[in-house]
Amino acid sequence: MLRIGIISPYSLTIPGGVQSQVLGLARELRKMGHEARVLGPCDGPPPEPFVTPLGNSLPTAANGSIVPLAPDPSAALRTIRAINDEAFDVLHLHEPIAPGPTVTALLLRLAPMIGTFHAAGDIAWYGRLSKGVNWIADFLDARIAVSPQAQELAHRYLGGEYEILFNGIESDLYLRPEISRGESKAIFFCGRYEPRKGLATLLEAFEKLSDDTELWIASDGEGIADLKAKYAHDHRISWLGRITDAEKIDRLAKCAVFCAPSLHSESFGIVVLEAMAAGAPVVASSLEGYRNV
């Protein structure tokens, strides 16, 4: 049995692809008998008993997204204290050069370290670190990329060798045989609101569909209110806000189509994988990250 520390740079109480991977991996490792703990920022109560919170996050712009990082000194001190106290056999750092807990752990070098690189596109901190301090990535004992696009970005700025291991999901959670799609004509969109996610494009296309079609939008974030006001006249649209994982799985089981209309910068389509696991027909943009699925 190993004591495994899994560190997330992103707030674990805010939904996101990296966060879901971190928590899901910890659950699976614990089922295998390992003592896995997750360290990361939390904006509220930790989502699992095995999570050690490292303080609140700060919204930070990256790759057309707003990501919840914790680059402040207090988070660094909590990270140092937690790693010292836990005496992990191995550390698994997700986005190891993202400002915050993962960089702190990388600099401490208190255990063998695996780094998993998720991002694709254009990430500001890669460019900054490449100018003199990219050597910190050499502290990693192994490097993983979740897709060829993530590998390309990391290698471009950091060099090194990477093993590609695609993201996974806990597929049994998405099997809902007791729910029937029936005659549903509902299109389902789920994800935080960012322009690159293509929700505005989906709404423009939806206006052209027949009156008996529905659109379920599970999304929140800055800018969603403007879209909601613009399409307030269309009563076929249900604005659900942020929903729980349980409700997401229910709607994936009921919808006629799951739509992932992202415009760019998708490293891997976890949400597409979830929809497929639930048996939902998927319409997605022709992006490399989605084709990996």
Please report, for each region that a protein language model flagged, where it lies by residue.
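N-terminal strand-loop element at the rim of the active site
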Residues: 2, 7-15, 22-73, 81-82, ...
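Carbohydrate-associated surface elements
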Residues: 42, 149, 168
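Membrane-proximal helix-turn-helix segments that form the acceptor-binding/catalytic region
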Residues: 121-143, 150, 156-157
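Acidic anion/phosphate-binding donor-loop and adjacent secondary structure
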Residues: 125, 152-155, 166-184
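Conserved donor-binding/catalytic core segment of Leloir-type glycosyltransferases
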Residues: 178-207, 216
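Nucleotide-activated donor-binding/catalytic signature segment of Leloir-type glycosyltransferases, i.e.
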Residues: 225-247
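Acidic donor-binding loop of glycosyltransferase active sites
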Residues: 253-267, 280-281
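Short acidic/histidine- and often glycine-rich active-site loop of Leloir-type glycosyltransferases
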Residues: 287-293
